[in-house]
Amino acid sequence: MSADRHYSPIDRFLLQADSALRTLLPFSGQPARPSPAIVEPDGELSEEDTRHIAGLMRINHTGEVCAQALYQGQSLTARLPEVREAMEEAAEEEIDHLAWCEQRIRQLGSRPSVLNPIFYGLSFGVGAAAGLVSDRVSLGFVAATEDQVCKHLDEHLAQIPQEDRKSRAILEQMRVDEEQHSSNALAAGGLRFPAPVKLGMSLLAKVMTKSTYRI
């Protein structure tokens, strides 16, 4: 990671383009860790449950697309090298989540959201803008975003039946990782966002969840 700070602007543009393709193209994200679902048995699910779980996993997959874009945008504009490296390391960890969710969506007979490119572009812009303001704001945005993700994961875990141990194992590990990302961002000096800002972020997140559940 440390060599990354010596890349030229063209090199960094190419790296960003490569990251976007790996995030958006099917089966292109290669996880560093195996999916937690591998060791879990298949459960008996009704057709209705299968459709609902696929919709929830599609939301989570799009959430990871947004996280990738957010981190990449922030790493592009981060001022301090250590902050840039922290963003890039977090993005690498999110690749695991991205791949795990896609694998599970396919197993459930569905596909990722067709809206992913739109949300990637929007999230990349937000991340880059946050980085331009300050590294402290950028890190604070990470913490607030990951807190929102944890809430969504808790809501989804409450809806997924115990019989679907594969999906539950994925979301449980994701929650552990996301909580750690939030803690790391605050420990690195991230700004604690006030409640009104978090409320606005929550309302925007609902737009994503409502739209990607089915498409």
Curated annotation (Swiss-Prot):
Domain of life: Bacteria
Membrane topology per record: Peripheral membrane protein
Pfam families in the record: COQ7 (PF03232)
Pathways per UniProt: Cofactor biosynthesis; ubiquinone biosynthesis
Disulfide bonding pattern of the chain: none
Iron found in the keyword field: yes
Enzyme Commission designation: 1.14.99.60
Gene Ontology molecular functions: 3-demethoxyubiquinol 3-hydroxylase activity; metal ion binding
Positions of Fe cation 2 binding: E94, E146, E178, H181
Record's keyword terms, sorted: Cell membrane, Iron, Membrane, Metal-binding, Monooxygenase, Oxidoreductase, Ubiquinone biosynthesis
GO cellular component: plasma membrane
The record's free-text note on cofactor binding: Binds 2 iron ions per subunit.
Keyword hit for Cell membrane: yes
Record InterPro entries: COQ7_proteobact, Ferritin-like, Ferritin-like_SF, Ubq_synth_Coq7
Localization, UniProt: Cell membrane
Single GO BP term: ubiquinone biosynthetic process
Reaction(s) the record says it catalyses: a 5-methoxy-2-methyl-3-(all-trans-polyprenyl)benzene-1,4-diol + AH2 + O2 = a 3-demethylubiquinol + A + H2O
Chain's role: Catalyzes the hydroxylation of 2-nonaprenyl-3-methyl-6-methoxy-1,4-benzoquinol during ubiquinone biosynthesis.
PANTHER family to which the protein is assigned, alphabetical: 5-DEMETHOXYUBIQUINONE HYDROXYLASE, MITOCHONDRIAL, COENZYME Q10 BIOSYNTHESIS PROTEIN 7
Cited NCBIfam families: DMQ_monoox_COQ7 (NF033656)
Protein family: Belongs to the COQ7 family.
Protein name listed in UniProt: 3-demethoxyubiquinol 3-hydroxylase
Source organism of the structure: Pseudomonas paraeruginosa (strain DSM 24068 / PA7)
Gene transcribed to yield this protein: coq7
